[in-house]
Swiss-Prot record:
Homotetramer, a dimer of dimers. One homotetramer interacts with 1 SecA dimer. This is Protein-export protein SecB. GO terms for molecular function: unfolded protein binding. It comes from the Bacteria.
Length: 170
């Protein structure tokens, strides 16, 4: 089924089975860790400040497959200097066959990022520890609430996740 979905054709048996939501592939698209002020930053006694940026992008690959990228940038500063910047783009290819556009949109905006998030959390924590810093654990994110906010913004004229190329912020 995987090759058929990625190639844009659903197998006849799949069509008879009804709607389907499948995880075709989960992968790291991009990863970066920078600690521009190491090793001096390890001795900084200032309270660290963390800034988290979260972004979701959706790209239609064909009629039945979408790439969803969950991007996280975590910046830690201490004493006005950057301690580290960890950036992760975790991606997945998801098959959506026989679903209405609204159902596809909900899955892309809620379930797909929920599936990708544990991978992001682990990778961010591992990067930070490998950089010599105490672990940081991303707290759970309510993607349903973020999707509801996206719907509210969309009511002001934006398009759906399924209709767009790279689109959607979470």
């Amino acid at each position: 089924m995987s090759d058929e979905i990625l190639n844009g054709a659903a197998a006849p048996a799949d069509a008879a089975a009804g709607p389907a939501f499948t995880i075709e592939k989960i992968y790291v698209k991009d990863v970066s860790f920078e600690s521009p002020n190491a090793p001096a930053v390890f001795n900084d006694a200032n309270q660290p400040e963390l800034q988290l940026n979260l972004n979701q992008k959706v790209q239609r690959l064909n009629d039945n497959a979408f790439e969803v990228v969950l991007a996280v940038t975590l910046t830690c500063t201490a004493g006005g200097k950057t301690a580290y910047v960890a950036e992760v783009q975790q991606a997945g290819v998801f098959g959506l066959v026989g679903l209405e556009p609204q159902a596809i949109d909900v899955l892309l905006g809620t379930q797909c990022p929920n599936i990708l998030f544990p991978y992001v959390r682990t990778l961010v924590s591992d990067l930070i520890q490998a950089g010599g810093f105490p672990p940081f654990y991303l707290q759970p994110i309510n993607f349903e609430a973020l999707y509801a906010e996206t719907l509210r913004q969309r009511s002001q004229g934006e398009t759906s996740l399924a209709d767009s190329e790279p689109a959607g912020n979470a």
